[in-house]
Amino acid sequence: QDKYKVYIDDKSIALPKKEFELLSLLSSKPDKVFRREKIMEKVWGEKVIVGDRTIDVHIRKLREKIGDKYFKTIKGVGYKFIIEE
């Protein structure tokens, strides 16, 4: 159970596997814009067909759990992770 936990401001937050994988991908290269297609491929796999809204829903859930300030939507392209100053 502990393997999908993140720590924000000394607070432990448990995440479902896909949310954790999405956060892990985006935070691996802060300020890099990840295209939706690349996110789908890396998190869900090339063989899995998921709707466009799937990524949006997972990002929304991450924003609710760890904070909106960490994610930026690049309209029509994808998302990027932002580290606080």
Residue ranges and their predicted role:
Residues 3-70, 75-77:
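Positively charged, aromatic-enriched patches within helix-turn-helix-type DNA-binding elements
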Residues 81-85:
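C-terminal edge and immediately downstream basic/flexible tail or linker adjoining helix-turn-helix-like DNA-binding
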